């Protein structure tokens, strides 16, 4: 996510893009949503989920608009540079001044109709053909302070991402293997385990968790010191596993409900659970930082905003189905932070393979993503401190940056493995900035720059449906209000303890 223009890659159809976006948004956050739903109450959860889905869609259209504006400016700068190069060639050649004046007047006559067409909404100048990452857009439209705040926000978000991933794998391994060690398969039967309970012999559950965390760090941590990327086949495999797991959980919960074995009696509203639910929902709708690599390769972008809207409706329906089947199938106090662990109970499913597949599902999928996110965070650190023309010493480049990437999240999850809180805090703070504040500022600043460069009559063909300034102000007020609300909620909760 470091700012820069990268290759667009192979083009694909709008509907393939719709599938890719669905897969991008529906990830780890969905596994923590059922617990957050149960804690906040079904009505509050549904209303908040729908509202936050709408807000996320709005800011997604802001980012698409900013991408189009960035592409237009890059084209305009290249046109200006070519014009300057041509003038330099003319001045260095032996042509007379009168010839140069004649050619200049001819060029101006040729360019005037082009510019007037662009102001009426030419499909060319605002076409999204180059992948301009969010960091590059921030550099184009923000001042130096804004760029630094952007990188600070995205770095904090990626730290939260790494912490969630680093905790999810050891938690899943601890829950499954400690149950085996106790000759039981009742991880999700409602039995409350403490961290000090025995796992195997003298080893406590918290000790097992930290051993798994150490092994996870030693196995995947070294990838932070190298360059890795997710291959096409690995992406297909992890996506396939994810959808098999989600479909299995929904079907198993529906079967249990249809047989009259449902235990859930969710409340309508519990305001104390809103803080975590807010963070989980924001985290679960997060896609804005990856939109450039997702939208740019789409071959036909004429109706891209409608396709994105369709995606959000499908995702909203999926989240609702997953969460409602969960809260009616399981009692509130038995729902686990990682929803997959509720299906490791023999009473839910007596097929051992399915139990272990669901219980260990986060281990496989998250382990493939961890090195990629770590390398992305490392590269953002490098971009933040980079100075034009400068290079980093070998020690700083190969040791210091990877170390400051890996150590902080591992230390955090060494002290806590509360996944719901980790997801909630990451979404409520850094996620809030990336999903609401940055897109709103990008839309506002890109509109100002577009008017400055092309004139007030310019029409961006990818202009957001929420084009009135009111919507930008609304998103900014909402984003800052969320910061205040979540912080006040945390302070008040801590003061009651």
From Swiss-Prot:
Coiled coil: none
Highest rank taxon of the organism: Eukaryota
Pfam families, sorted: Aa_trans
UniProt membrane topology term: Multi-pass membrane protein
Keyword Membrane: yes
Topology feature Cytoplasmic, residues: 1-10, 57-148, 227-234, 299-306, 378-398, 443-471
Transmembrane segments: 11-31, 36-56, 149-169, 206-226, 235-255, 278-298, 307-327, 357-377, 399-419, 422-442, 472-492
Keyword presence, ATP-binding: no
Broad class of the protein's primary localization: membrane
InterPro entries: AA_transpt_TM (IPR013057)
Cellular localisation: Membrane
Extracellular side stretches: 32-35, 170-205, 256-277, 328-356, 420-421, 493-497
Glycosylation sites per record: 194
UniProt KW keywords: Glycoprotein, Membrane, Transmembrane, Transmembrane helix
PANTHER family: TRANSMEMBRANE PROTEIN 104 (PTHR16189:SF0), TRANSMEMBRANE PROTEIN 104-RELATED (PTHR16189)
Family per record: Belongs to the TMEM104 family.
The protein, known as: Transmembrane protein 104
Organism annotation: Gallus gallus (Chicken)
